[in-house]
Structures are given as structure tokens and as C-alpha cells.
Amino acid sequence: MPKGKKAKGKKVAPAPAVVKKQEAKKVVNPLFEKRPKNFGIGQDIQPKRDLTRFVKWPRYIRLQRQRSILYKRLKVPPAINQFSQALDRQTATQLLKLAHKYRPETKQEKKQRLLARAEQKAAGKGDTPTKRPPVLRAGVNTVTTLVENKKAQLVVIAHDVDPIELVVFLPALCRKMGVPYCIIKSKARLGRLVHRKTCTCVAFTQVNPEDKGALAKLVEAVKTNYNDRYDEIRRHWGGNVLGPKSVARIAKLEKAKAKELATKLG
């Protein structure tokens, strides 16, 4: 058999020599050796993380956290839910500023007053009883009586009374008797006004002539926000807000349903 000739193909030009950049090698000290950490179970000490979620908190903290979550998860009836709508900060500041002028006297002040009166009497100047100055009236029973007798000009209720049943009837009573009422944040702030740790509610009965204009303005703002909106407030339920896990689970189910429906429809 004759030998077949080899087909000569075109030679491809050699690639131009690529000038390689000389990378400067890092000088490694042989005395420093790598010790990579292994954060597996039972291996190296774990790095510092935010472990707030896993802390065993004191009982009172645990309870207040659970209560706040329950108020979000459960359906809260309008009578209780209305206490989540507190007065805005600006109006509340004005209200507290006015209320501060009508704080009841402390035990020391009363002692001083009676002592001065006794000294006057001993000096033979005669004992003339002084007129009682207008002060804030505090406490559920006192305020309820004042509202029923229509003697209260403005009622201020704390939003975080515990148990809430103590004051849950007050907004309805105030509205029925035509007394302006408002809900303000923190029973401690009201307590400070009347020299106590906390206070459920306070009421204005009388004010000095120079403060009547300021009180009238507050009453007008309060009526617009609470008394006039009573029908709207008593329709609004609260809570029923799911947590992130439940939201994620429902979203996953919805996604799966949508996918299944899409495959059925083709």
C-alpha cells in the first residue's frame, strides 16, 4: 500500500509572551504559625455574640414582656384598646405644666402652715380659717364622685393602670356626664403630681382666674381627641398582630398554594 501524504496545515503564530507582573511576596515570619479556630460544638471558645434572647430574665421582666406580647397577639376589645391611644406629647406637656401649679401640699408644708397658724393664735391675733386653695383631686373613688356630681372640669387618666379594670369604666362615665377626659402616658407622672409613686387618675375642679384660658384651650383639644371621637374609638379592636415566625409560616404556605395553582393551570 502506498503511504498517504500528510496534509500540511497552517501553523498558528505563537502567542506573544505575556509579561508577568512580579508580585512582591509577603515576608512571612516563620515564628508565627497559623492556628485557625474551630467553632464547632465542644471545640474552641465561641466568639462574643448578642445572647439577649437566651438570658434567663428576672420574673417581673419576663411577665411584662409576656404581657406586652399577649396584648399584640390577642384580640383586645375596644374598651381596653382605647388606653393605647394616649395624648400627644405637646398637649401632655402643657397639661402637666398646668397641673404642676395645682399640686396638693406635702406633709411638711401642711405642718408648717398649721404651726404658723398656731403661733398666730398663741400671739392672740385671732384664728381666721384660710380659704382652701384650688388643688388637683386624685384617686379613682374621688374622681368618680366628682364626675357623677359634674364638679370635675377635666379628668386625666393614666394609660398603664394595672389592673386596668380600676379605670376601664371612667371614659364611658365621663362621656355620659359630659366631662372632658383624656388618657396620658405613665401613672408615675400622675403620681409625681400628687406626691405618690403612682396615681390612676386626677381631676381639675377649680383653677385660678389667670389659668382659665389655658384650661379652656386644653379642654377644647381634649374634647376633639376623646369625647367627640368616642363612637369611633369604641369600634376599634386592638391586637391580632402575628409574630415574625407565624408571618413567615403563612407566607410560605401561601407561596406553596400559589405554586400549586400555577402548575394546575399550566
From Swiss-Prot:
This is Large ribosomal subunit protein eL8. The keyword Protein biosynthesis does not apply. GO terms for molecular function: RNA binding. Pfam families: Ribosomal_L7Ae. It comes from the Eukaryota. The keyword Cytoplasm applies. SUPFAM superfamilies: L30e-like. Component of the large ribosomal subunit. The ribosome is a large ribonucleoprotein complex responsible for the synthesis of proteins in the cell. Belongs to the eukaryotic ribosomal protein eL8 family. Its main location: cytoplasm. Residues 104-130 have a biased composition (Basic and acidic residues). Keywords: Cytoplasm, Ribonucleoprotein, Ribosomal protein. InterPro entries: eL8/uL1-like, Ribosomal_eL30-like_sf, Ribosomal_eL8-like_CS, Ribosomal_eL8/eL30/eS12/Gad45, Ribosomal_eL8/Nhp2, Ribosomal_eL8_euk. The gene is RPL7A. GO terms for cellular component: cytosolic large ribosomal subunit. It is found in: Cytoplasm. Component of the large ribosomal subunit. One of its GO terms (biological process) is maturation of LSU-rRNA. Residues 104-135 are annotated as: Disordered.
